């Protein structure tokens, strides 16, 4: 059955790839992008692909008027996919960057989601609706120097789990999607962010040491996986009426996370 799906952060990466894929499968897509210059190129790409069921709109989560407008649209599934990441040592990162990362990844998606859900319930058509959150493998464990970003994903995991319990009565389904470190440019850009503020004259963490740690990770197979695998899974998961609450891809990362969580019980100080 065809669904109407609103996607945030559809201007690039997972969101764009999955939006196009779901449209090709017959779903009606409202693909939203952060800034106006992204709108026309994505519309033109959809037209070139012959996708008449692909609508592109601007939705800047920092703009309350954009959020209010999006909350008035009719759709069956809200996919909160937009996000931003700050990396670097938690003990030295400027707190205003931590606060901003939570604003983009947690608070503003929650504002959008609350308004959408409350409208569904108020209008009596909540049964069968769905909200999906793009979390991360980092929503389930915390590697050094990624603590700020993954703490926002830990928060999303808690919000999603609470919503699943709170909204069952209303027939609203909740899911998370937890990608591994796929090569979309997102993680690579995030790894560049600390070098805006990290200063060898002021900070204890040295730029060269942090850069080497990031570069070593991205040089491994786990640090540059082909995103097609994840996009294909998103195309299946997001429109589905049934499925798992939490969807970790690939399987090797799911297994690693399970082992990490078991081992955490014996972690020593």
Task: Indicate residue ranges for each PLM-predicted region.
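Substrate-binding pocket helix/loop in short-chain dehydrogenase/reductase
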Residues: 89-90, 97-100
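Conserved Rossmann-fold cofactor-binding substructure of NAD(P)-dependent oxidoreductases
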Residues: 61-74
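Conserved glycine-rich cofactor-binding loop
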Residues: 11-13
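Residue(s) in the substrate-gating loop at a strand-loop-helix junction
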Residues: 136
């Amino acid at each position: 059955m065809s669904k109407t799906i609103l996607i945030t952060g559809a201007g690039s990466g997972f969101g764009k790839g999955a939006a196009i894929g779901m449209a090709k499968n017959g779903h009606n897509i409202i693909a939203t992008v952060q800034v106006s210059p992204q709108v026309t190129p994505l519309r033109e790409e959809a037209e070139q692909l012959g996708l008449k069921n692909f609508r592109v709109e601007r939705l800047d989560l920092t703009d309350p008027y954009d959020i209010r407008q999006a909350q008035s649209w009719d759709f069956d599934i809200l996919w909160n996919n937009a996000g931003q990441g700050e990396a670097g040592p938690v003990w030295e990162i400027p707190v205003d960057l931590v606060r901003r990362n939570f604003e983009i990844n947690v608070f503003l998606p929650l504002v959008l989601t609350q308004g959408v859900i409350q409208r569904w319930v108020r209008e009596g058509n909540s049964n069968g609706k769905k909200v999906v959150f793009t979390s991360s493998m980092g929503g389930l464990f915390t590697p050094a120097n990624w603590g700020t970003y993954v703490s926002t994903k830990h928060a999303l995991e808690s919000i999603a789990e609470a919503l699943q319990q709170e909204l069952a009565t209303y027939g609203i389904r909740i899911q998370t999607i937890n990608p591994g470190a796929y090569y979309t440019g997102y993680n690579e850009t995030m790894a560049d962010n600390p070098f805006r503020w990290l200063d060898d004259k002021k900070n204890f963490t040295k730029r060269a040491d942090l850069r080497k740690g990031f570069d070593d990770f991205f040089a491994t197979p786990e640090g540059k996986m082909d995103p097609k695998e994840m996009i294909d899974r998103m195309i299946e998961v997001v429109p589905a009426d049934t499925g798992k609450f939490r969807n970790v891809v690939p399987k090797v990362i799911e297994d690693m996370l399970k082992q990490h969580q078991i081992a955490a019980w014996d972690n020593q100080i």
